[in-house]
């Protein structure tokens, strides 16, 4: 996935991945992480996700990263927030209370920014990336998070030869390989969601599971 592909999706309104509600799996499993109040939570490829509003409501400082300026502006407009804006080497920062979105490339985040994160939430980032980028993403983003950083990762597992991504299939074997050596990825939930995803049914996908992981950055 290159930047133009992602930006075109937002410009053309092809954003079926955007949910109009908070993710129930986030609400169920995030409290088990015990991320300290006031801790900074990274949300990569954030779009305009309502999950960020929920996380902020838990007393956390949310740091979303999103390439599309349109998505960032829609997030603040749709949530009646008026952000302060400033520029840095990491991108264009939009800040409103304990919500901050950087309009920029997640790979441009500085070491200090990632090391300061106490938590990470990834519902739509890893599965949006083709395989070569997934390896780089796990290494250069997760590999630079601070020791003890905890998070929730949600992926999809389906026969990749039955549908072209994104979202891509990222099964448990790949997750373990991607995070080996720097992050513990423990599978805590797996459920069949094929009957809830008509797009996959229409394309002839025979099986579709969602997988939920508890992540912890190792020392």
Curated annotation (Swiss-Prot):
Its main location: cytoplasm. It comes from the Bacteria. GO terms for biological process: methylation; response to metal ion. It is found in: Cytoplasm. Keywords: Cytoplasm, Methyltransferase, S-adenosyl-L-methionine, Transferase. It catalyses: S-adenosyl-L-methionine + a thiopurine = S-adenosyl-L-homocysteine + a thiopurine S-methylether. S-adenosyl-L-methionine binds at residues 10, 45, 66, 123. Disulfide bonds: none annotated. It holds the Pfam family TPMT. The keyword Plastid does not apply. GO terms for cellular component: cytoplasm. It is an enzyme of class 2 (transferase). Belongs to the class I-like SAM-binding methyltransferase superfamily. TPMT family. This is Thiopurine S-methyltransferase. It comes from Bordetella pertussis (strain Tohama I / ATCC BAA-589 / NCTC 13251).
